[in-house]
Amino acid sequence: MRTEWVSARKGQANVSQMHYARKGVVTEEMAYVAKIENLPESLVMEEVARGRMIIPANVNHTNLEPMAIGIASKCKVNANIGASPNASDAAEEVNKLKLAVKYGADTVMDLSTGGVNLDEVRTSIIGASSVPIGTVPVYQALESVHGSIEKLDEDDFLHIIEKHCQQGVDYQTIHAGLLIEHLPKVKGRLTGIVSRGGGILAQWMLYHHRQNPLFTRFDDICEIFKRYDCTFSLGDSLRPGCQHDASDAAQLAELKTLGDLTRRAWKHDVQVMVEGPGHVPLDQIEFNVKKQMEECNEAPFYVLGPLVTDIAPGYDHITSAIGAAMAGWHGTAMLCYVTPKEHLGLPNAEDVREGLIAYKIAAHAADIARHRPGARDRDDELSRARYAFDWNKQFELSLDPERAKEYHDETLPADIYKQAEFCSMCGPKHCPMQTKITDADLDGLEQVLKSQGAAELVGVKQDKL
């Protein structure tokens, strides 16, 4: 799709969407995004130039269909996949990618940590993906020295970062906000550092007694990113791993640094989004979103959940989707899904499906709550189909049509029941939607009440209830 678009840009010193937007150029990617988001091209260009919207689109990922992440666009959902040393292989990860895209993932992150040829897995995923692909390069940096922190040097990090750019990775989680002076702030936490990338860098700093190399070499990383239009996803190494640790001094100290790094990247015209928690009580979610907007000049916020309770292993796609919906309502731009296997094991294909649907629900609920134009159209169309007992239309409009049809057909599988004016819940005689009260019926009732001297009925609009 993008081969012709990017051919003229390759070799230029800066090919980022932000760079072109700041020059007043509407790229083909911006025009494409404007169309699918139903936004003016000028607004997309202005938001990208401002840093409030990103279009993750590496020039080497030519089969990508561009999409936008930002408060002006629809709330997006990311799905994580990836092989571990103990489970999965390259073919299975590509299948997970296809399943994730099928069920609505807007971006996919390859979090492979070992057990396979990481470059082979990554290039296979990128080659098969029409959605942006993100990675966490510190995983491969550590794997490249066989897990020996003491052998890992600054150039190893930058070498892997550029390799990912060359392969077509659209955004990379860069844990540059974790500083050596932040580490003592972890004292008193119940769960310490729960970011894998953050943990690697914390170990590196503790061993070498030196500052985080991703921080000290941040400008060098910016120089790499702008040559490929790779986007920063600034990692939150000190995100809370439980309710107890939410919004603590460690988390907020790193967030302040992430704001500084956001502005540094923008000086290079490099796109940025900022990652966020994690595990956060419901009453602290709004504070966390607003604080990120304040510290990071409204760069798109990308949160993992957050989980609103810690007592439901096996159901954390639910505990986190609750928090994700609220975070999206308050302005979070992208939600990173959580599967039922979170904290328990590597998710399989069915776990990916369950997590994604939970998060598509959360993102859609957030869009409705934020009154995005057209956000509720599909809901209204499904409701009309439900009222008309148009079962096939209901399935078609569902986030997961296969599951909706499967559940309906468990008890009423025959085709004749696709025209039935009931389901197995109420049966043929007790469905309340069979009670068709028309406007004409109500007009007639009003006339009767008026003739009897009763007060005129006053209609109440649904949105004012």
Swiss-Prot record:
<keyword id="KW-0479">Metal-binding</keyword>
<dbReference type="InterPro" id="IPR002817">
    <property type="entry name" value="ThiC/BzaA/B"/>
</dbReference>
<keyword id="KW-0411">Iron-sulfur</keyword>
<feature type="binding site">
    <location>
        <begin position="195"/>
        <end position="197"/>
    </location>
    <ligand>
        <name>substrate</name>
    </ligand>
</feature>
<dbReference type="GO" id="GO:0016830">
    <property type="term" value="F:carbon-carbon lyase activity"/>
</dbReference>
<keyword id="KW-0862">Zinc</keyword>
<dbReference type="GO" id="GO:0009228">
    <property type="term" value="P:thiamine biosynthetic process"/>
</dbReference>
<dbReference type="GO" id="GO:0051539">
    <property type="term" value="F:4 iron, 4 sulfur cluster binding"/>
</dbReference>
<feature type="binding site">
    <location>
        <position position="175"/>
    </location>
    <ligand>
        <name>substrate</name>
    </ligand>
</feature>
<keyword id="KW-0784">Thiamine biosynthesis</keyword>
<feature type="binding site">
    <location>
        <begin position="236"/>
        <end position="239"/>
    </location>
    <ligand>
        <name>substrate</name>
    </ligand>
</feature>
<comment type="pathway">
    <text>Cofactor biosynthesis; thiamine diphosphate biosynthesis.</text>
</comment>
<feature type="binding site">
    <location>
        <position position="279"/>
    </location>
    <ligand>
        <name>Zn(2+)</name>
    </ligand>
</feature>
<keyword id="KW-0949">S-adenosyl-L-methionine</keyword>
<feature type="binding site">
    <location>
        <position position="109"/>
    </location>
    <ligand>
        <name>substrate</name>
    </ligand>
</feature>
<feature type="binding site">
    <location>
        <position position="423"/>
    </location>
    <ligand>
        <name>[4Fe-4S] cluster</name>
    </ligand>
</feature>
<dbReference type="InterPro" id="IPR037509">
    <property type="entry name" value="ThiC"/>
</dbReference>
<feature type="binding site">
    <location>
        <position position="426"/>
    </location>
    <ligand>
        <name>[4Fe-4S] cluster</name>
    </ligand>
</feature>
<dbReference type="Pfam" id="PF01964">
    <property type="entry name" value="ThiC_Rad_SAM"/>
</dbReference>
<dbReference type="InterPro" id="IPR038521">
    <property type="entry name" value="ThiC/Bza_core_dom"/>
</dbReference>
<feature type="binding site">
    <location>
        <position position="431"/>
    </location>
    <ligand>
        <name>[4Fe-4S] cluster</name>
    </ligand>
</feature>
<dbReference type="GO" id="GO:0008270">
    <property type="term" value="F:zinc ion binding"/>
</dbReference>
<comment type="similarity">
    <text>Belongs to the ThiC family.</text>
</comment>
<dbReference type="GO" id="GO:0005829">
    <property type="term" value="C:cytosol"/>
</dbReference>
<feature type="binding site">
    <location>
        <position position="275"/>
    </location>
    <ligand>
        <name>substrate</name>
    </ligand>
</feature>
<comment type="function">
    <text>Catalyzes the synthesis of the hydroxymethylpyrimidine phosphate (HMP-P) moiety of thiamine from aminoimidazole ribotide (AIR) in a radical S-adenosyl-L-methionine (SAM)-dependent reaction.</text>
</comment>
<feature type="binding site">
    <location>
        <position position="80"/>
    </location>
    <ligand>
        <name>substrate</name>
    </ligand>
</feature>
<keyword id="KW-0004">4Fe-4S</keyword>
<keyword id="KW-0408">Iron</keyword>
<protein>
    <recommendedName>
        <fullName>Phosphomethylpyrimidine synthase</fullName>
        <ecNumber>4.1.99.17</ecNumber>
    </recommendedName>
</protein>
<keyword id="KW-0456">Lyase</keyword>
<dbReference type="GO" id="GO:0009229">
    <property type="term" value="P:thiamine diphosphate biosynthetic process"/>
</dbReference>
<feature type="binding site">
    <location>
        <position position="343"/>
    </location>
    <ligand>
        <name>Zn(2+)</name>
    </ligand>
</feature>
<feature type="binding site">
    <location>
        <position position="302"/>
    </location>
    <ligand>
        <name>substrate</name>
    </ligand>
</feature>
<feature type="binding site">
    <location>
        <position position="139"/>
    </location>
    <ligand>
        <name>substrate</name>
    </ligand>
</feature>
